[in-house]
């Protein structure tokens, strides 16, 4: 018998996806403006804005595979989230502070690399801690949190930008420092995975026992027919 879905943990995990949404909305809206302050080349601006897609082609599957084969006391996915998400947040907060094109390009390039290194482990964490029959519900909660993050940054971020162009980036950057700690404290990945594996092994043993009993009950009938 499967356990009930722990909505508290799913909402906590959804906070990570909320922050991801809060990162990309201001980035896509304001990064072209920042670049336009230093260059009038639309080709360069379009190229820089495509860095995340280029990075995703290589980094997402690479770090997905790396996290699959990672063995630590805190789990497989959590190390990437706990280390790389805050680092990405710091780089993200530095973007609007750059005063030269070269420094802006370097910080932006590093940000796109680092943020891609924790996205796949974040996505993979959900099926690791949620049973198969509950994953559609969990996915719905996570998508809701992502949408909520977009709404928050659209309404709040635009007002912050009017006050100071760096404030929307500071907000998402600060949350990128806080949320990984919350995830680490509330989602004990290694413990959940171990318990799920024990439960799976128990179910397999029970199914095997039932199959053996059924086969034993059939043997006298087969002998009588023979």
Regions found by a protein language model. Give the residues of each.
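Juxtamembrane intracellular "pre-TM" segments in multi-pass secondary transporters
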Residues: 1-7, 191-225
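Helix-loop boundary and gating motifs at the non-cytosolic
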Residues: 2-55, 220-224
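Interfacial helix-cap and linker-helix signal at transmembrane-aqueous boundaries
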Residues: 35-36, 66-67, 71, 159-162
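Glycine-rich segments within core transmembrane alpha-helices of 12-TM secondary carriers
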Residues: 56, 136-161
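Cytoplasmic membrane-interface "Motif A"-like loop-to-helix N-cap segments
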Residues: 69-84
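C-terminal ends and interior cores of transmembrane alpha-helices
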Residues: 80-100
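Cytoplasmic helix-loop-helix junction between adjacent transmembrane helices
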Residues: 109-145
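Symmetry-related core transmembrane helices of the 12-TM Major Facilitator Superfamily/SLC fold
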Residues: 167-185
